[in-house]
């Protein structure tokens, strides 16, 4: 049966997808056969219905195969009907425009081809485009973009003559402001394509359109690029472009007046219809000056660095001018209602100000902090251009300011991380590049938790990127910046190694080796905790990678910091993967990949040093082979980073890197030759060969036997100076100036050769040339290391003054500070040494450094503390450091923490005696250069820092420094802060250090010094400590007072003297009595006073006063929050006059830091006992001693050993006889719990036992041990084992349930620690923390709790703020209406801030907390919510109504139940 149009119309109108796919090809065959489809051209009505069905049902089908088939059928209809299809365009074009925005590339491409075909065969381009203008305003952004791309294709196929472009350009100009970046890019590409065809008239026309200048600048730049590229196609008459009446693309030009209005058929056929479909591979994009990458939206670091300076020039006339500019910028950026182009201009202006030197102004950093919120808002903007500019500006700030951008980087980093998974490439890549730049330039430890927390993201893309960031961080940062977060890094890398995503795993393995280069012990520990399969994967990753810690391509390509120009040269890897580095090989076997030799031309003791290093390096496990030694084993300025080496290389010779001045040096690995060590590899680095002398050559002789004896002689011929050696070297040796004898210690035999050659080359005109390497010769001191002193005698005055007795002209002082700093930052030790010499010159010339130079120099010096070349560089560094501190001490307050802690750490290292003396000198200068109180606070912070694990030598150094500091401090410098209390408690435990008597003695002396410094304040501090600590300190002070009284009575000169404070001439404080001077011995007259006025009775009276003050002062130190301070004169008089023994009081409420007036009065009464004679007479000097039994009840076994150093033998006999009771069981548990990060299983058991005890109502245990238990539990929350952390929280929760009243004085500390536990990476710990926080909310006084929580809610980050808000909501349920009214102004700001938080859970918790407040005070809450927007207020009201409904239902149901 013949199938006609009716049949096919029925097939087209059916809905079944499967049948459509079957019918489609048959319909195409039908249309191709003109004989079968003869009725197609006869029945117009059926044709209209068929085209309508194809356009609406097929082309618009959700199944892309059906849509493609529909377009194929339409294409055949166009071919068949030609001009007659023109009547169907109104039906077809809307559907085809919709398909230009299809998600499938194939659909979009075929759609574009069909449109081009319609323009060619059914109509003309102008006719079609006049009906497609609505596509420029289509709701789908892909359609808008597709219409632009279709226009580009039309221009490429038909030229500009075919279109009236003046009608189209306004639509394109509208798209330049489109919200979507891809549409904006496509619109710009359209204009560029029009410019290619039309020429300069486009530029003139656009200037009249009223476009913003910034937008025009971008477009005109593209025009210029196209013009320079030579791809212009001027196919239209210029004069007609901007004249709407005369421009008609259909009008034939003079050159082709007889031609058809359509382009010739052959010309159209010659162009492929698919050449201009998408911006990526299209010819259009290629012709428009390389806009393909921009069309895709991706950015890289090169784009950022180019954009850094691509900003308008501005000038800053004053700090006020800068402040006004930044205020305007903040005002624009803080309001997202401003035009987005204004915001982009504001962001660019920040970069302009930076380039104009804004960082030099003091108020810049204060203003920059105020911009944090504006930056966050910009980074969250919906417009990609704003986000892009914000990220570029953040990257620029980081690269210019470095670590001074710490606060801004920390604030903005979480927001920028949210950009990483963004589907818009421009936003995602902007965020990624900004993070990379911040990591590279701003080395702030607080960024590490932000990065590691994102490593556990649910998004695979985010995890991959985060491990990339972590890898970059481990490559770029110095070890000291990572130390605080070692455990977090290890845990994160472990998770990465176990990650489900294979790519994330690979990067995590790379991170592991970067981590190993900083913390080998921790890395090895992590390695052993992994399953064998993961261990094998790590080792195979090491073997298979030719560059384990290699820099990513983007890192190698660009970096704007000056350090990047001098980035340390990497160790070279041979094809087998073995590392040739300065570190000694761990195997005694010499392999081709690890050939090394001692550098005897540099150091006369190098052979011995090399052997010792090799021996010490052989114990590394589990990495036995040289290949397993990670690059960068030295955490120093010259830390190694590997670079990729050609896989084709088969020799063990390293490739030739170029140094910072452009010269290339070949580090040849060679065998030692018998003739001369001047041919050694190091010699090739250090000297240049000028030629061979033609005259007779002399061998210098040592003038005396003494000198011969001091220079070690080698018995072979390899080290003897020879004529050939001098001839070879004489013209390349740099001349030496006159240098003081203290500095003339030769650090290498090269210097000896230089001195000898200088003496031989007098009068030679060729020696006038400038030296190759030594540019900065010092006027001051050289290093005088003991190890190098053998050659010092050869360095005589004559050999240095042989150049006419003066400093040569080339030894000039350079003003090129940047070059000096570049040398100091070099990876080559000799260049670092050279830089230090230049720096000494600068400092001695009183050349003060700018703020930026100081900042950079501090960063370099921080790295130099870990320099491995102690004999060559570190000693000179210490000398330079002393000068630097003396000259710039007023500008180094921010760097003091690093300076002081690093110097103290160095005191614990194995250094030569001379180097250690220089470290000590640096410490002395530091102590005298900075405020004492600031140094004291830093030391207290350092002692309590749990990330620091000082060895015994470092502990001694810290304690001695504190002692010397205390002898110079003013009493007011000693502040009783929480940090000081923790530090003092740790010093008390150091008095029982079992491994070192030096530590014990130094700790005891420090406690005595602090007691003498400010007796009342120190007494208050002891009162706030747990009783066990109090007892240990009090016993020690008892013995000290007794001993000092005996010694002062016997011999006044034996009394310990104290250096007078530089702040005041008198040591007495208002709270100290005259007898306190006996502790310090300020002057001979004061000593006489002590001898005359002090007797044993007075000493014991003083001691009793001190002890009573410790025990009693805090009874009045904390009063109930709801009651005013009441003074009971009777009690006060009793406190002041009664003769109390040393036994412990009954109450446990002894600790308190916030002293109220009554508490201070009580303390003053107690300390006043130091002035009074005791009411009783004593029978003898030992008539009033400590009663050991009074102490034994409250001293656990740990404290007994702690006090062995400070008690007498007869006291110890009594201590041993104490029987063990229930209290001793708790003491043993506490002793076990004090083994932090050790004995995991035992401590778990101890915590379980403690959990049982907490449930028993044993008053004596809590009276005695509560403070100690609490302190240990809170400290245990920082334990490495997550199970122990969770268990500690459960014990804490149980104590809160059973002993809530005891937490009154420790509320703030307990709340803070519990909330911090919510950040834990283990769910078990977080769950325990939530339970503990819930119990806390119900246990502590509501007002006290809220006062602690309010500042936390306002300042803390997620998840701490979330936990605090939830806790506050529970507390509000317990508070009275009146009390809530009073503290409402403190509560509301934090909740409103939380309502705006990016985390939905924080917003939700804030709303619930506001609902809880409303349920207490009702409508009185409304005035506080005035700043909420309408939508937020609406949401809040909705939740309030729900809560009211729920409450009414529950109350009615309870009423029903009671009546029933």
Curated annotation (Swiss-Prot):
Q: Which family does it belong to?
A: Belongs to the CLASP family.
Positions annotated as HEAT repeat: 87-124, 163-200, 407-442, 443-479, 942-979, 1272-1309, 1390-1427
Chain residue ranges for the region called Disordered: 237-293, 545-605, 640-733, 778-800, 1041-1084
* Organism of provenance: Xenopus laevis
Biological process annotations from GO: cell division; establishment of mitotic spindle localization; microtubule anchoring; microtubule nucleation; microtubule organizing center organization; mitotic spindle assembly; regulation of microtubule polymerization or depolymerization; regulation of supramolecular fiber organization
Give the protein's biological function: Microtubule plus-end tracking protein that promotes the stabilization of dynamic microtubules during anaphase. Plays a crucial role in chromatin-induced microtubule formation. May also act at microtubule minus ends. May be involved in the nucleation of noncentrosomal microtubules originating from the trans-Golgi network (TGN).
Regions of compositional bias (Low complexity) in chain numbering:
279-293, 550-569, 645-659, 789-800, 1042-1054
Which Gene Ontology cellular-component terms appear in the entry?
basal cortex; centrosome; cytoplasmic microtubule; Golgi apparatus; kinetochore; microtubule organizing center; mitotic spindle; spindle microtubule
Name of the protein this chain belongs to? CLIP-associating protein 1-A
Q: Where in the cell is it found?
A: Cytoplasm, Cytoskeleton; Cytoplasm, Cytoskeleton, Microtubule organizing center, Centrosome; Chromosome, Centromere, Kinetochore; Cytoplasm, Cytoskeleton, Spindle
> Which InterPro entries did the record assign?
ARM-like, ARM-type_fold, CLASP_N_dom, HEAT_type_2, TOG
- PANTHER family assigned to the protein according to its UniProt record, in alphabetical order: CLASP, CLIP-ASSOCIATING PROTEIN 1
**Compositional bias ranges of the Polar residues kind:** 571-597, 669-681, 715-724, 1066-1078
Alphabetical keyword list? Cell cycle, Cell division, Centromere, Chromosome, Cytoplasm, Cytoskeleton, Golgi apparatus, Kinetochore, Microtubule, Mitosis, Repeat
An example Gene Ontology molecular-function term = kinetochore binding
């Amino acid at each position: 049966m013949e199938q006609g149009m009716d049949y096919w119309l029925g097939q087209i109108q059916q809905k079944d997808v499967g049948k459509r796919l079957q019918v489609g090809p048959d319909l195409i065959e039908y249309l191709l056969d003109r004989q079968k489809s003869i009725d197609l051209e006869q029945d117009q009505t059926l044709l209209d219905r068929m085209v309508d069905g194809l356009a609406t049902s097929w082309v618009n089908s959700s199944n892309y195969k059906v849509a493609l088939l529909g377009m194929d059928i339409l294409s055949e209809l166009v071919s068949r009907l030609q001009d007659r299809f023109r009547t169907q365009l109104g039906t077809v074009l809307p559907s085809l425009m919709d398909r230009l925005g299809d998600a499938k590339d194939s659909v979009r491409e075929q759609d574009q081809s069909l449109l081009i075909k319609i323009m060619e065969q059914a109509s003309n381009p102008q006719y079609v485009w006049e009906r497609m203008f609505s596509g420029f305003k289509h709701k789908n952004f892909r359609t808008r973009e597709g219409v632009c791309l279709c226009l580009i294709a039309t221009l490429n196929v038909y030229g500009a003559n075919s279109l009236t472009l003046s009608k189209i350009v306004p639509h394109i100009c509208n798209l330049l402001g489109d919200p979507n970046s891809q549409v904006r890019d496509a619109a710009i590409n359209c204009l560029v394509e029009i410019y290619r065809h039309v020429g300069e008239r486009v530029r003139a026309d656009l200037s009249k359109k009223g476009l913003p200048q910034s937008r025009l600048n971008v477009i005109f730049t593209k025009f210029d690029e196209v013009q320079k590229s030579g791809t212009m196609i001027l196919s239209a008459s210029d004069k007609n472009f901007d004249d709407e009446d005369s421009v008609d693309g259909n009008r034939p030009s003079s050159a082709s007046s007889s031609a058809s209005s359509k382009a010739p058929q052959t010309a159209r056929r010659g162009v492929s219809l698919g050449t201009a479909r998408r911006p990526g591979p299209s010819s259009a994009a290629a012709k428009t000056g390389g806009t393909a990458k921009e069309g895709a939206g991706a950015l890289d670091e090169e784009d950022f660095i180019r954009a850094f300076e691509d900003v308008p020039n501005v000038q800053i006339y004053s700090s006020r001018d800068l402040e006004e500019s930044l205020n305007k910028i903040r005002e624009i950026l803080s309001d997202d209602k401003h035009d987005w182009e204004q915001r982009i201009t504001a962001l660019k202006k920040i970069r302009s100000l930076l380039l104009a030197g804004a960082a030099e102004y003091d108020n810049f950093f204060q203003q920059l902090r105020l911009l944090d919120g504006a930056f966050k808002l910009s980074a969250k903007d919906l417009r990609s251009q704003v986000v892009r500019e914000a990220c570029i500006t953040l990257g620029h700030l980081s690269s210019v300011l470095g670590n001074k951008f710490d606060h801004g980087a920390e604030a903005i980093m979480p927001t920028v991380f949210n950009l990483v998974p963004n589907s818009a490439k421009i936003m995602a890549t902007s965020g990624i590049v900004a993070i990379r730049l911040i990591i590279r330039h701003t080395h702030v430890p607080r960024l590490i938790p932000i990065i590691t927390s994102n490593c556990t993201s649910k998004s695979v893309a985010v995890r991959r990127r985060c491990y990339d960031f972590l890898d970059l961080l481990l490559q770029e940062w110095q070890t000291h910046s990572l130390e605080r977060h070692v455990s977090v890094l290890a845990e994160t890398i472990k998770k990465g190694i176990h990650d489900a995503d294979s790519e994330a795993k690979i990067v995590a393995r790379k991170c592991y080796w970067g981590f190993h280069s900083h913390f080998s012990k921790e890395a090895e520990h992590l390695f052993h905790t992994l399953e064998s399969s993961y261990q094998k994967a790590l080792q195979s990753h090491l073997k298979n990678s030719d560059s384990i810690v290699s820099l990513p391509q983007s890192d190698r390509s660009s970096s704007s910091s000056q350090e990047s120009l001098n980035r340390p040269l990497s160790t070279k890897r041979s094809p087998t993967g073995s590392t040739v580095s300065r570190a000694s090989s761990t195997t005694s076997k010499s392999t081709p990949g690890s050939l090394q030799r001692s550098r005897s031309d540099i150091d006369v003791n190098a052979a011995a040093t090399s052997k010792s290093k090799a021996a010490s390096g052989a114990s590394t496990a589990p990495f036995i082979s040289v290949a397993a030694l990670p690059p960068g084993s030295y955490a120093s300025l010259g830390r190694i980073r590997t670079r990729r080496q050609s896989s084709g290389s088969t020799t063990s010779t390293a490739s030739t890197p170029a140094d910072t001045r452009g010269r290339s040096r070949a580090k040849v690995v060679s065998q030692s030759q018998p003739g001369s060590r001047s041919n050694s590899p190091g010699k090739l680095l250090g000297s240049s060969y000028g030629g061979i002398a033609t005259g007779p050559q002399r061998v210098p002789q040592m003038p005396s036997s003494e000198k011969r004896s001091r220079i070690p002689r080698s018995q072979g011929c390899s080290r003897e100076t020879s004529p050939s050696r001098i001839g070879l070297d004489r013209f390349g040796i740099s001349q030496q100036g006159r240098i003081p004898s203290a500095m003339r210690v030769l650090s290498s035999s090269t210097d000896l050769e230089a001195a000898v050659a200088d003496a031989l080359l007098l009068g030679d005109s060729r020696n006038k040339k400038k030296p190759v390497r030594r540019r900065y010769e010092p006027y001051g001191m050289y290093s005088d290391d003991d190890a190098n002193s053998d050659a010092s005698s050869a360095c005589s005055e004559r050999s240095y003054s042989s150049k006419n007795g003066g400093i040569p002209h080339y030894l000039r002082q350079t003003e090129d500070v940047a070059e000096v700093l570049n040398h100091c930052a070099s990876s080559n030790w000799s260049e670092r040494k050279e830089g230090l010499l230049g720096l000494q010159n600068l400092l001695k010339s009183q050349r003060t450094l700018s703020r930026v130079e100081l900042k950079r120099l501090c960063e370099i010096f921080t790295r130099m503390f870990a320099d491995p070349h102690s004999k060559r560089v570190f000693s000179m560094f210490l000398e330079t450091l002393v000068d630097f501190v003396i000259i710039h001490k007023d500008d180094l307050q921010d760097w003091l923490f690093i300076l002081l802690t690093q110097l103290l750490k160095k005191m614990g290292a194995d250094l030569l005696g001379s180097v250690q003396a220089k470290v000590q000198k640096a410490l002395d200068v530091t102590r005298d250069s900075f405020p004492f109180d600031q140094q004291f606070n830093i030391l207290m912070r350092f002692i309590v820092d749990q990330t620091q694990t000082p060895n015994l030598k470092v502990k001694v150094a810290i304690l001695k420094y504190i002692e010397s500091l205390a002898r110079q401090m003013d009493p007011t410098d000693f502040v009783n802060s929480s940090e000081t209390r923790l530090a003092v408690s740790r010093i008390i435990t150091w008095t029982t250090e079992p491994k070192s008597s030096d530590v014990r003695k130094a700790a005891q002396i420090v406690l005595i010094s602090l007691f003498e410094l400010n007796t009342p304040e120190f007494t208050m501090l002891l009162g706030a400590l747990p009783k066990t600590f109090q007892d240990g300190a009090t016993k020690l002070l008892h013995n000290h007072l007794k001993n000092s009284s005996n010694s002062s009575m016997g011999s006044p000169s034996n009394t310990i003297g104290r250096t007078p404070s530089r702040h005041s001439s008198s040591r007495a404080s208002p709270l100290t009595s005259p007898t306190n001077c006996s502790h310090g011995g300020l002057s001979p007259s004061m000593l006489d006073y002590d001898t005359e006025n002090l007797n044993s009775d007075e000493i014991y009276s003083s001691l009793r006063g001190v002890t009573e003050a410790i025990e009693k002062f805090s009874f009045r130190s904390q009063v109930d929050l709801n009651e005013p301070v009441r003074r009971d004169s009777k009690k006060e008089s009793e406190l002041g006059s009664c003769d109390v023994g040393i036994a412990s009081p009954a109450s446990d409420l002894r600790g308190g830091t916030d002293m109220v007036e009554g508490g201070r009065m009580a303390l003053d009464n107690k300390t006043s006992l130091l002035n009074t004679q005791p009411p009783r007479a004593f029978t003898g000097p030992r008539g009033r001693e400590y009663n050991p039994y009074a102490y034994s009840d409250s001293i656990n076994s740990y404290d007994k050993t702690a006090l062995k150093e400070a008690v007498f033998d007869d006291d110890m006999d009594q201590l041993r006889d104490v029987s063990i009771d229930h209290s001793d069981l708790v003491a043993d548990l506490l002793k076990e719990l004090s083994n932090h990060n050790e004995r995991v299983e035992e401590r778990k058991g101890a915590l379980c036992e403690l959990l049982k005890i907490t449930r028993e109502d044993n008053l004596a245990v809590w009276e005695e041990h509560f403070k100690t238990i609490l302190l240990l539990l809170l400290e245990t929350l920082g334990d490495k084992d997550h199970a122990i952390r969770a268990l500690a929280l459960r014990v804490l929760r149980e104590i809160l349930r059973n002993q809530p009243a005891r937490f009154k004085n420790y509320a703030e500390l307990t709340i803070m620690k519990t909330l911090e536990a919510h950040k834990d990476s283990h769910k078990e710990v977080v769950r325990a923390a939530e339970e503990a926080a819930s119990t806390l909310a119900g246990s502590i006084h509501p007002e006290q709790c809220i006062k602690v929580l309010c500042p936390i809610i306002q300042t803390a980050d997620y998840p701490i703020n979330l936990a605090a808000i939830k806790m506050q909501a529970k507390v509000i349920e317990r508070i009275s209406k009146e009390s809530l009214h009073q503290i409402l102004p403190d509560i509301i700001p934090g909740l409103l801030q939380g309502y705006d938080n990016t985390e939905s859970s924080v917003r939700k918790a804030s709303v619930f907390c506001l609902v809880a407040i409303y349920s207490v005070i009702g409508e009185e809450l409304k005035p506080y919510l005035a700043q909420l927007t309408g939508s937020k207020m609406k949401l809040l009201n909705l939740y309030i109504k729900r809560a009211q409904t729920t409450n009414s239902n529950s109350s009615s149901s309870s009423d029903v139940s009671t009546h029933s």
